[in-house]
Every structure is written in C-alpha cells, then in structure tokens.
Amino acid sequence: MAATPQSLFPSGDDLDSSQLQMEPDEVDTLKEGEDPADRMHPFLAIYHLQPLKLHPLVFAPGVPVIAQVVGTERYTSGSKVGTCTLYSVRLTHGDFTWTTKKKFRHFQELHRDLLRHKVFMSLLPLARFAVASSPAPEGDSREIPSLPRAGPEGSSRRTASKQKYLENYLNRLLTMSFYRNYHAMTEFLEVSQLSFIPDLGCKGLEGVIRKRSGGHRVPGLTCCGRDQVCYRWSKRWLVVKDSFLLYMCLETGAISFVQLFDPGFKVQVGKRSTEARYGVRVDTSHRSLILKCSSYRQARWWAQEITELAQGPGRDFIQLHRHDSYAPPRPGTLARWFVNGAGYFAAVADAILRAQEEIFITDWWLSPEIYLKRPAHSDDWRLDIMLKKKAEEGVHVSVLLFKEVELALAINSGYSKKALMLLHPNIKVMRHPDQVTLWAHHEKLLVVDQVVAFLGGLDLAYGRWDDLHYRLTDLGDSSESAAPQPPTSCSDLPATPDLTHNQLFWLGKDYSNLITKDWVQLDRPFDDFIDRETMPRMPWRDIGVVVHGSPARDLARHFIQRWNFTKTTKTKYKIPIYPYLLPKSTSTANQLPFTLSGGQCATVQVLRSVDRWSAGTLENSILNAYLHTIRESQHFLYIENQFFISCSDGRTVLNKVGDEIVDRILKAHKQGQCFRVYVLLPLLPGFEGDISTGGGNSIQAILHFTYRTLCRGEYSILHRLKAAMGTEWRNYISVCGLRTHGELGGHPVSELIYIHSKMLIADDRTVIIGSANINDRSLLGKRDSELAVLIEDTEMEPSLMNGVEYQAGRFALSLRKHCFSVILGAAARPHLDLRDPVCDAFFQLWQDTAESNANIYEQIFRCLPSNATRSLRALREYVVVEPLATVSPPLARSELNQVQGHLVHFPLKFLEDEYLLPSLGSKEGVMPLEVWT
C-alpha cells in the first residue's frame, strides 16, 4: 500500500529527532587541528556564485561549525497575548564568528524542512552516492538529542535547559554535511557563498529581505513618484560586510547591487523615513536603499548590526579624512617611484605575471598592442597577450576606458574595447561616459589582486615608453623590422613582425611626435604613421609610482566605485556578463602575496578628483593637498607638470595653486628666508600644429592661459612678484623646460622633451604623484576625474638644506636627486653635488645651465618657441633663416658638445605681442573657455 503524503512528510511539530538519524556513510568527518584559514573559500568564488537552493558549497570543507546558544530575550508581542523568547545563537566557523537570533518556531520550521529533504533524498535511487561523506568516528553517536516540545515559557531553569537542548540539536546537525549544506540550514544560519571569504572581511549580517526599487541619487535613475505607483518590492539575499552591503538574486545567485559605505552613510528605522512598515533605510552618497523586515524588532536589529559594522571595521570610509579625501593616510606603506615609462612598464609587466585573482585597469587611453619590456624579441611582453594569458589562467580582468568624443580625439577607445573583449570571456571592458562631452576620465591606474597598485601620468598607450636617454631616432634594421599588414578580421590578434632580431624600441604607431602629427588608424598598430627616416620622435617624460597594501586597497575601492557606478548607470552594462566588483577588506591588506623590489617605507594617502558624473560623488582632495603642501613648505618646491594654468581671477580660472606659490614666496621674502621654486613644463602644449606658423588654435589657447599664469596680466605669478620685490623674484623661482638632440639623416636634429609628469616635491620629505595637471580641469573635481597619492617620508637620511645638515626623506630625496641628475647631465659632471637644492651655488648652477643650453640650441637649431619671436611677424622672419645644423653640421656638432643635460629656460616672451585665444570664427573659438583651463 502506498504511503500517504502525511506519512511521507511528517509535520515536525514534535521535532522527533529519530526521523533525522543518519546512516554511517552520511555522517561527515570533521578534521580537527587543521588551520581553518587555509581551507576557506578563495576570493575568486565571488565570480562563480550559484542559486542558494542548488546547495552550493558554503562552509569550508573539514572546518567545523560550532553553535552556542548564548542568551535569550523575552518580549511581549503587540498582536498576541503572552511572551515570546528569542534565542541568540553564536556560531563559529574557523576564524569567523557571528550571531543570529531565532524563535523556537524557526527551529521547528528548520526541522520540517530537513525532514522533507531527507524523505526526498531517500526516494532518489542515487541520492546516497550524491553526498560526499565518510564513516563517522568510532564511538560517535548518530542519534540527535530530542528537542523539547513547544509550550508556554516557564522558569529560568527550564529556559536554560531548553537553550542547551537547542544547542546540542544544532551542533549534532552541523556535523552532518547532508544537513549542514542544505539550503534551509544555510538560510537558518544566515550564511552564503560570500560569508567565509577572508578577503571580504568579517562575517556580517545576512538573510532574506525585501528591498524596494529606486532610490538612486543619479540623474535618470531617480523616480519622482510615490511608492505604490513607481516602486516595486523584491525578495533578495542581503549581505553586509565591513565597508559595503550587497543583495543577490535568490533565483540565480547573481549580485544585483553593491552599496559602498561612504561619508553619506546613515541608517534609519521607521515608517516616517522609509515609507514602509518595519522598514530600514540605508543612505549613502549614491543611493537610499529601503529594506522591509518582518517585524519592528528585526528592523532594529538589522539597523544596529549594519551601523556597528560600518562604524567598526568600516569606519575609514564613512568619514572624510585629511584634505577631505575618502581615504586616510596609511603609514608603513611600501612605495616605489618611476621616472619615465621604461621602468614603470617593466614593473607593470612583472606585476601582471604575479596576478592570481584580479587585474583592474583604467586609462585615458589604452593601446592593447604596446610592449611593456623593450626591445621586444617576442610577443611575451605585449600587453594584450599578457592579459589573455592571465585570463586563461582564471584571472578576471576589468578595464574602464574613457569614451571620447570621436570628432575631438583620435584615441579610438572603441577599437581598444573590441580588441580586448575578443581575447577571453574573463576580460571585461566598459567605456564611460556617454553624455558628458567636455570632461574626461583622465586617471591612470592598474591594480593587481587589490594589493599592488600603479598610478601616475602614464597611460598604457603609444608614445609613453621612454628612458633616461630620450632617443630622437629609432631606425634599427629596416629589413628586420618591416611591419606586416594588420589582420582582416578584428577577431584575430594584430599580427606582429618577426621580432627575433628586432632592434626597435618603438614599433609602428609607438614611434610618434604628437605635435607634428596626431595618431591615426589605430586599428593598424604596426604601421608607421610618420616617416622615421626624416622625422625625429618626441621624447616623453613622465612620473609613476607603485604602492602596496592598504593604499592599493583604497585605489581598488575607487576603481570598484567607478566600475559599479558605470554598470548601474549604463543600461548596456546591466547584463550579467558584466559583474559587480567587490572591495577587499583592509583587515587583510598587509597580507602581501608579493612585493616589487626597490620599495621604500612611507605614509601614503590616496587623493582624487571626482564628480557626480564620473563617480557619483564630489571630491577635490588633490587640490586641497597641493594647496596645503605649498603653504606648509619650508625650503623649496619642485614641480613637474604637463600644464600650469592657475592664479584665480574668480571667473575664468578658479584653482589657487599659483596664488599659494606667490604667497609662499612673498612670505619668504618678507622673512628674509631662502626659498626656491623650480617649475618644469613642456616647451609647447601637446597638440598637433605647425609651431613655425604659430602652432594652431589649440596650442595657442593653452599658451595663452599658461602665460597668463606665469608672466602676463595682473593675476600672473611674475607680475605680482615684481610688484612686491622688483627683480629679486629671480632669486626665488625658475621656470624651465627640457630639450635634447641627436642625429638623423646625416645632420643634427633637436626636439623638446614632452613633460607629461604630474609631480610635486616639497622639502625632500613630501611628494605628490598622480594624473592631475595643474589646471581647473584636473583639480576642481567637477571636471576631469583624477587620481594621486600624497607620500610623506618616515625614514630619513642625512642631507643638506641651504648649507645646513638636514634630515631628508629617503623616498623624496632619491626621486628628486634622480630627476636633477638626468636634467643637469650629472653623469658628465662627476663633481656635481645634488644634495642641497636651496643654496645659492646650486640655484645659480641651475639657472646658468638652463641659460647656456637654451642659447646653444637656439644658435644651432633656431628652435621654437623662442624669446626672439615676440610676434607672428617676427616668427615668420625667424623661421626663414637656415639653422647652423643645416648649414654646417660639423660645426653644429662641435657646439652641441657644450650642452649639459636637458635643461633650458622656458621662453616667457614667446608671442607676447599676440592675442593667443582662438578667434570666434574657429571651432576652437566657440568652445567654452573651461575646456582649456
């Protein structure tokens, strides 16, 4: 006779434990004495989440789960007569400990679910073989102690006895994988696949919750209607960690949203703030998330737990820090500087090889086919191929690219995205923004496993690789370096030449001179676009830095914020193939799987410029750090920057970096203090244009605002200094550029060294390195997005400052001395002492070197820009005269032997008689002035 449904599915009201007895092969053997941390789930599990009801592996194999009923709460329900008891259950799994609160009826519901599970499994012929298990230890009883029946609450002795019964009941079940891994048990214990990943931090609050749609603080995502009209409620699995919360789709296991805690964090309970009975409202700068609980008591409990997590381990991110940065100063950080792209790219390549979990990249421009180590003799060091190999190993690569206005920029981010996305499913690329046409994502960042982060001025793009030689030519052996045609299908990697005997440093599009000609046909990466037989390349000077540990976590968090923001705001990225990213906890930040050699210990703080359009929040901590560092400097400032547009007039230019420099010099002059300011800028802006005819509208527009900052007009630095001290300003500030020379086509050639650095050194103790130029675009926060780090030395070494013994920081001093050594040609001047940047002798040597080199280059090449050309008429007359390098190459070579290093004075009088802003009739003239500033 067939069994009735009643006999198959007992009610479970009496919690008869005999119905849950296990056969010997169903009892899980626990391995005591092992290190639990070694058996916890790897971080990559976040990319392979499954629906909860598919019984995914939640607990670490072999690591026991121990339950302890630590207390009870008795309360009177508002809708019932009598009291209810809430049991606090503390659970431990390895290093993870968490508490859940349950009523007795929850135990009854669990018992019924487990009974149904056992009955169903007993009806499946192969069910016994589907459970991975082993025999129980000898003498281990397989009977589960019976639970007391439900009844009225009695004495404290009876309550304590009931606690012990519940505790034994749970612990007995938790030794059996058959029940422990069942979804009803994991829901009861409030655990998921994200609970026991050490890099995600402590085990926080979890459970099934109802959440309300909407609440985003992003234009276009905010509903202006009322709850019942515009919103919908959905059941989700909520996970709260120390610095964020997320919810997952119950049906698929996919992460549906991630809310990072930030200074806008606030938790509220009640219908007034949530418009929902038993509601909890979690506010951040990006969203007001409304959750609905089953009771007011649960709402208070959840609000308390979320708040305690955020104010405890996650407190770093719910408050602003020095300079109003989202990240605090991180002492004891390993940091290493890089001057020029050769060392930076090589270190990036080494870090990519060490990646085990994730690689994050964001650039203004990314060229997939660049080589990170040169000269290349194979494709092993080609960026796209390296990323493809790591993706094949299981590493997840996430790339954020600036989506340019194609009519204005020729960086072809669409090609870069396609080229990378076709390599492997583990490589995901997103572009942003769509609607913003004036501003850019200008930051440059690469993060490996959220423990090592590179940033600075260097995009992983054409033209950026260079070394201290600043070569103007790269001819090699043309027979060995002929580039093939690009592929006919973009599904193939671009073919490369046979590199076995390659001698070239810059292949194809990498050989460039951005003022002579901007890049074209980027989908043909190995075709030259300028004639390297007749045109010298333009050397590229840049500064980068790598940091380890907590600052790398902070930088990864910034990337994750931008990635998740882009996924949320752009409809095309809401599909599951673009995953939400999760930040690792700072609690494991010092567990470094690898470090790069050459690092020095310092205090590092991450700074940024972001706005609502770029990251969903506003911050301009880079500007604040610049102003503070200049204001507090005691001896000198050394600035290398691609742009220098400052000195606020309250209308056109708003940042006050130049104003702070003026104030600091005036303070030194008033106090009779020796104070120096060194400023290095590119001799010309990096836009395509013929400087012999004035350079074009873009070049002239940037020159206008640069000269307005330096020396022209009432707001300029030199105008204000001259008004206060006359010619003595020359004792305080020097403005220079860099130039070099070489041989091409049988005669000498010269070219400026394009300074793309974004660096400030103060007093040989403080350094700012990043992607931010000195202009409003980079510094105000409301325009371009930028990243930087403020590095403060904690390890000192003896040096000199104005002839007096001085304790200089190892990081800042080594960086500054390296820069000065290359700039001044110290390799050919063995007696040059670079320790003291302030004394009169060194400052005079600096000025004399710049003047001598500038005079020689002007005599030999009649190079531009020049102080001799103060008007367009003078410029036309100047360029028609044949330079000595053409007329008499041997004599020119002889004179060039007198050049020392690369330093030349910046020509402050170039085209000073001309109005350099574009005319209104030009396309540049109709653009807002903010584009140039």
Swiss-Prot record:
Subunit structure: Interacts with PIP5K1B. Interacts with EGFR.
Domain PH: residue ranges: 203-311
Region (Disordered): 1-20, 134-160
Gene Ontology terms, MF aspect: phosphatidylinositol binding; phospholipase D activity
Protein name: Phospholipase D2
Topology in the lipid bilayer: Lipid-anchor
A cellular component term, taken from the record's GO annotations: plasma membrane
Region (Catalytic): 441-788
Segments forming domain PX: 65-195
Gene name per UniProt: PLD2
